[in-house]
């Protein structure tokens, strides 16, 4: 009887450790997706950045991205993020520095990002528009 009790305790500990590893992996995947999005904008790979965006509301459309070649992103920083476990989303704040190519003006913009996890595909997607850069 005593060994069954210890076996149950060990099993519970292992299961809770597995859940922690799964959540940690999920967090690592989110960070990788966020980095991909921001690096893609930085290096003018706008199609790659757009591929990260998938709206939960399928009626929503991505705005045209062809005007983005008028700016150059010079820096990006993930300022903070807040997870919402109820609907498996994370709201993050990113700060982008950029230059208007024609004028040479330097700007900064804060971008609120809503990330959601697709359980079927086991991937994170951005449910927000591209940053609202001043193009001219």
What is the meaning of each model-derived region?
Residues 1-7:
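Bacterial N-terminal signal peptides that target proteins for export
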Residues 10-13:
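Short, linear, compositionally biased motifs with a strong N-terminal bias
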Residues 15-17:
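C-terminal motif of bacterial Sec signal peptides marking the signal peptidase cleavage site
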Residues 19-21:
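Bacterial signal peptide processing site
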Residues 26, 31-33, 41-91:
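Short solvent-exposed beta->alpha transition segments
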Residues 85-136:
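Exposed beta-sheet edge and beta->alpha loop/turn motif
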